[in-house]
Amino acid sequence: MADIHEVVTRSLNINEKLGPRLKAAAEQNAILRIGWTNAGDPVPKNGELGLCPALPEGARLRALGVLGSWVAAFGQGGSFTIQGDAGSFLGAANLGTTVVCEQMAGHFTGYAMADGSITVLDGTGDDAGAAMRGGILVIRGASGARIGGGMEGGLIVVHGDVGPDPGAGMSGGRIVINGRCPPPAPGVLLRPLEADEVKEINATLDDESLHVPSDAVCLMAQEKLHFEHGGFVVSSGDLSQIGLINEENPPLRTYQTVDTVALIGTRDEVKSLALPVPLLANLVSGSTMSPDGNTPADVTSILNRHPALVEAEPRAVDVMLIGQSNLLDVASWLPDAGGFAVDLDELPPMNAEQLDGLLVALRSVASTNVPVVLIQGISRIQALHARAAYHGVDVAMARIEDGSGLSEAAALPMMGRSKKEHLQGTMTQAGLLLGFAASGHDLAVLMASGVDLVACVAPTADGEDIAYWLQGTQDDLAHHLRRIGLSSVDLLDRKHLRALDQETAAVSGLRLAGYGRPLPHWFAR
């Protein structure tokens, strides 16, 4: 078996070579082939992943061999046929591509698809059609557990047996099963097909070998009361009870220049993003940071040089935050972004191979060598840092508001221990995603604790107000650096921090102001 890093490199190279050929082949109505030599001799692929993302209209591809995860994801049109097996997330976030897998497909086939069709001719793994919003998924052969889980629309047809918990959490769409079906999940209705439905479905399938018989059953969501989730438990504090001191250096002059610049991505091959202050504003849309003709020149200058973490319409300096809610927009928006962040909490749990497949697909859609960020809850920071280092991403960012209720002060020693264990000696930076708008003091405290980059919600949705907040935060950070006698944010260290009360000292392990040492329980074995 080839080394996984070799597989990733091969996969990226295949996508890079295919890119310029797709448009020309579509204009000539030609089929591009993967797994054959130029002379037509078969050379089956073995494990290549993330292949052929965001296929455009008119593209026609055929692949031979056993492929990995996230193949033909984010499709916009055209067709993709696999003569062999496919891994997990085949055709995920499909918006119009016709995908055919002539043998078996893995878990999460058709995940979050909204249009197009996917046909698998020898069964699938678990969670086929999960989070599906539209389109058609046809499976011949057995399918695993939770088929159609969380689906909102579309049609799934299974000619074979399905596993336990079919339709779990579905709120729309139909699952037609021509085979054995266990009792459906709560809130799901199992009923026979009506004659008109059989005709309508078979007309939609347009393939006699896949037509459903009249004795097939249909699963649909039942009407039920909708309970609006109240959201995560928020953290129990902020960073106001942590002070900044320097017992060694005198203060700098009030007019002395200090360095507050930070980079996203420190590898030589990465197109790093420069931040005037180590802070990314977390916004819904990059258009919020796009000045118009009436915006003052100084505000325009601030907005243009500050990257942001956005879910939609990224600018060339922005990092696009990718989760289930905007997977369908990846092909449209990601090429314009200066980097991307994968929200692991918003996507299904993935093993190393599946995450590699997603990263290959996204890197192939994005601009060349942009920085990559992984985001996950603070309670899973050890796993996050280990995965980030293994996959060679640029930033591992822990989200404070993950439902655990852990405070920012309690997160600091967790961050420090995990960074030392997993990120030391790597080029992966440690980040923190806050649930409140950070100040310059907050940034100084976090930088001194070993955090390289902070993202947080903006205090306002108005672009001009955001510009004033960003400039004020930079000035506040510079003021604290001058006050404690440091010329650069890179010189901040844990020795500059003091807990201002016992509760903060107890959970953070910082020296208690006045006592001069951490509380005794931090030394207990």
Kindly give the residue locations of the regions a language model identified.
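N-terminal capping/small domains of soluble enzymes
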Residues: 2-60, 209-337, 476, 487, ...
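Charged, low-complexity surface patches
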Residues: 64, 159, 377, 435-436, ...
